[in-house]
């Protein structure tokens, strides 16, 4: 099962692109689940170390819904809008709060496969920096990061929204990078299942 996580507090561009990625994966035979931060209460990590002692997060909010989804996930597709040249505060909170999962089980994420999507209002608005933040999260936690590879989707799927849903839908280069990244992500998942 693959969990798609939308890190946008708004409904349009990032959610749309993530939905398209999940459809592509479903067409390849994968089961997917969708999680959005929109409308959810996900507080930032307090780094209080409660999770180190008690093996769970002390902050009881909507993050527990995602914790449950991630338990069965073989793959993670994390999508973020670009805010100030990086990830959204909401997806950063999600990544930081996953500390509790690793505190409870150091190998929680080990062997899962991850890809990243970033949607920016400008063509060169920080998409690659946002993706690097997500890939760093993956690496630190034992998730196998997958990119689209050389020649056009180097570290993940990048979109230029022009701050509209219509802009995303018209971004042919963005969809090319998405198709390449989804293809390599699916191939890695298939290889991992065959191991």
UniProtKB/Swiss-Prot annotation:
Binding locations of [4Fe-4S] cluster: 45, 48, 51, 57
Cofactor names: FMN; [4Fe-4S] cluster
Gene Ontology MF term list: 4 iron, 4 sulfur cluster binding; metal ion binding; oxidoreductase activity
InterPro entries: Flavoprotein-like_sf (IPR029039), FMN_Rdtase-like_dom (IPR005025), ISF_SsuE-like (IPR051796)
Protein purpose: Redox-active protein probably involved in electron transport.
Keyword RNA-binding (UniProt): no
Assembly and interaction partners: Homodimer.
Cofactor: binding comment: Binds 1 FMN per subunit.
A UniProt-annotated Pfam family: FMN_red
Superkingdom field: Archaea
Record's keyword annotation contains Metal-binding: yes
Family: Belongs to the SsuE family. Isf subfamily.
Protein name (database record): Iron-sulfur flavoprotein AF_1519
Keywords (A to Z) from UniProt: 4Fe-4S, Flavoprotein, FMN, Iron, Iron-sulfur, Metal-binding
């Amino acid at each position: 099962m693959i969990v798609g996580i939308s890190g946008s507090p708004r409904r349009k561009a990032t959610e749309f692109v993530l939905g398209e990625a999940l459809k592509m994966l479903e067409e390849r035979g994968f089961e997917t689940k969708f999680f959005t931060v929109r409308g959810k209460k996900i507080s930032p990590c307090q780094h209080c170390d409660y999770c180190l002692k008690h093996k769970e997060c002390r902050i009881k909010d909507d993050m527990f819904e995602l914790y449950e989804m991630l338990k069965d996930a073989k793959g993670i597709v994390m999508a973020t809008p670009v805010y100030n040249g990086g990830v959204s505060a909401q997806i950063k909170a999600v990544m930081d709060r996953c500390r509790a999962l690793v505190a409870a089980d150091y190998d929680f994420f080990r062997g899962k496969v991850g890809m990243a999507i970033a949607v920016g209002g400008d063509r060169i608005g920080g998409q690659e920096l946002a993706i690097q933040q997500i890939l760093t999260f993956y690496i630190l936690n034992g998730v196998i990061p997958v990119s689209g590879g050389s020649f056009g989707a180097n570290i993940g799927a990048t979109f230029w929204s022009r701050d509209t849903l219509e802009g995303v839908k018209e971004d042919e280069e963005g969809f090319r990078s998405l198709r390449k990244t989804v293809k390599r992500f699916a191939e890695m998942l298939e290889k991992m299942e065959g191991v």
